């Protein structure tokens, strides 16, 4: 599926973006930074409302023509609205770290988003699908930091900053209609992050590069893969997270979660499922689905 297929292309799309830019930039003396900040706040609120109200929205980037850097500004502004309601930051997630995910989503760049405590669901419990619009699930690896990460790390340093690793599943739920978006839209939408289920953490960080990954629905294998699909070694996701956070002027406190990215393509969720992931030598995680998406 090419998720950018409906975002518009060619002269018509370029003209629309140019007209939008002109309308914003030539406000008869209006301060551009004020206009830009207002637009970012407006788009952040649109995405926040879509998530809160479980109401999909049309893609935003084709209309407003924002850049990737501006998409991250929208993302942070949207997460700030969550924080203002009392949600607490708990870590970060990386996206498009596997070739399968890039192909499925029709993009070619690694992206990252922010996690809050409201996104965490109890392992083994029922996850109400009415919390989402059109949820999908993907098997992942999650790291727990033992020390503050305040600078870019090398692969050789990473283990010294980690308390453990766990099998995990991420529930993704694009706020865009029919799960169709371009790169800027998905970044603004916090990389589609909606929920996280974690298994037990283990301190054993050895040999993470090629462990078998199986995700099952009601006991039937629906996705098979390897941790090697995550940048060749999931520990490289920690390196990338440290670089991205530092570039954004952020630190990751001790006790932060780092969702390393998907090992396989995502699968759509439906009511009445027992969903599980097992990772060789690491353990498993599971949940059930209740309600209706």
Map each language-model feature to its residues.
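Intrinsically disordered, low-complexity terminal tails and inter-domain linkers enriched
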Residues: 1-35
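Catalytic-core "active-site belt" of small-molecule-metabolizing enzymes
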Residues: 32-233, 247, 270, 274, ...
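Short strand-turn-strand beta-turns centered on an Asx-Gly dipeptide
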Residues: 217-218, 260, 280
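A conserved acidic, glycine/proline-rich C-terminal tail/linker
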Residues: 238-266
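Short, charged beta-turn/beta-strand-edge "cap" motif at the junction between a beta-strand
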Residues: 263-267, 281-284
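Carbohydrate-binding surfaces in secreted/extracellular proteins
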Residues: 277
């Amino acid at each position: 599926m090419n998720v950018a297929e409906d975002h518009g292309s060619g002269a018509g799309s370029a003209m629309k973006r140019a007209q939008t830019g002109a309308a914003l930039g030539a406000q008869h003396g209006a301060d551009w930074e004020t206009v830009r900040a207002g637009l970012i706040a407006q788009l952040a609120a649109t995405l926040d409302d879509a998530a809160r109200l479980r109401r999909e929205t049309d893609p935003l980037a084709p209309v407003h023509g924002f850049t990737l850097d501006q998409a991250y500004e929208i993302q942070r502004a949207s997460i700030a609205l969550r924080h203002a309601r009392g949600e607490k930051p708990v870590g970060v997630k990386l996206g498009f770290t596997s070739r399968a995910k890039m192909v499925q989503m029709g993009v070619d760049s690694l992206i990252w988003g922010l996690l809050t405590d409201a996104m965490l669901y109890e392992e083994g419990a029922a996850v109400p699908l009415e919390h989402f619009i059109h949820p999908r699930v993907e098997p992942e690896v999650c790291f727990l930091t033992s020390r503050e990460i305040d600078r870019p790390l090398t692969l050789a340093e990473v283990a010294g900053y980690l308390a453990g690793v766990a099998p995990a599943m991420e529930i993704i739920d694009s706020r865009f209609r029919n799960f169709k978006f371009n790169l800027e839209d998905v970044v603004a939408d916090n990389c589609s992050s909606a929920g996280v289920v974690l298994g037990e953490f283990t301190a054993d960080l050895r040999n993470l590069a090629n462990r078998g990954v199986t995700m099952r629905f009601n006991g039937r294998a629906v996705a098979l893969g390897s941790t090697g699909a995550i940048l060749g070694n999931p520990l490289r996701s920690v390196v990338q997270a440290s670089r991205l956070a530092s570039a954004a002027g952020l630190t990751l406190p001790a006790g932060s979660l780092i969702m390393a990215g998907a090992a396989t393509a995502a699968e759509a969720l439906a009511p009445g499922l027992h969903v599980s992931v097992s990772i060789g030598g690491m353990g498993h995680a599971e949940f059930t689905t209740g309600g209706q998406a």
